[in-house]
Amino acid sequence: MKKSAALGRLTALIITAFVDMVGLLMIIPLMPYYARNFGASALMVAMLMSAFTAAQLLAAPFWGRVSDRYGRRPALLVGLGAAAIAYVVFAFANTIWLLLLSRIVQGAGGGTTGVVQAYVADAVEPEERAKALGWISAATNVGVALGPPVGSFALKLFHVHGPGLIAAALCLFNIAFAWRYLSESRDMVEAKKVERRKGASLIAVKHVFTHSKEAAPRLIWVYAIGIGAFQGITAILALFLADRFGITADRIWVIFTFMGTISVITRAGVLGKAVDRWGEVR
């Protein structure tokens, strides 16, 4: 693939991932406050926050086959469409169960993270993938930094419906942008010739459990434990800050913006140089 074409595709992908994360992080910090308004317990809030990941995990094998068979672009557009629907449900939710439904719909729609990573694998040369993923991560972390204040200000200006509706509008913009500027990264003529082995996803998962001492499964375990710990903190952070320090929904953005800013500095300023100096494995 020509370098200019790969760069253009990567740029479009970075913008898509950034806008998607802004919409997501408009909602995540506010979700516990909305749930508490409906009388949810701390356990229910944690379940609510994890519903997206659980639904995404269950739907992942299906969307993996769709992505391989029909292309990355359609799978990404479906994920963005599911997110738009989920945000509208969130905006008008009047029970905890509708909040839960919004999370499940978004997760079952496939999300975007896996598809974005597959895009990078298709479009970028192997020696440049770590840097490309670093820039994608930096873009999403800029979204982490900017999404919470936008969500909190939307709540102030437009009340409870505002964050969900603005996040849905961002999703619709993102769909239009991706449709126009993000070309398919997979060679679909060749893809249709390749038959995906039945049960390949389950075999891969089993391999991670049964061959945990190998490099790839070990890396997956390290990542899973790290991201699991982070997500666990995120799920209860708003409740902890509200109970301990009286942080309200219109001020929670400060904490998430700080976290996102630190992540941007690490991913964009440190990761690429570290890979250049020590290599991907180290």
Predicted segments, located by residue:
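Pair of pore-lining "gating" transmembrane helices in MFS-fold secondary transporters
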Residues: 6-32, 213-233
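Short amphipathic helix-loop junctions that connect adjacent transmembrane helices
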Residues: 29-42, 235-251
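Residue-level signature of mid-helix packing/kink "hotspots" within the transmembrane helices
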Residues: 53-61, 111, 144-145, 260-268
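Helix-to-loop junctions at the C-terminal end of transmembrane segments
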Residues: 60-70, 266-280
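Helix-loop-helix hairpin linking two adjacent transmembrane segments in secondary transporters
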Residues: 136-180
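Juxtamembrane intracellular "pre-TM" segments in multi-pass secondary transporters
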Residues: 2-6, 183-221
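Cytoplasmic helix-loop-helix junction between adjacent transmembrane helices
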Residues: 102-141
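Conserved MFS/SLC helix-loop-helix module at the cytosolic interface between two early adjacent transmembrane helices
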Residues: 57-94
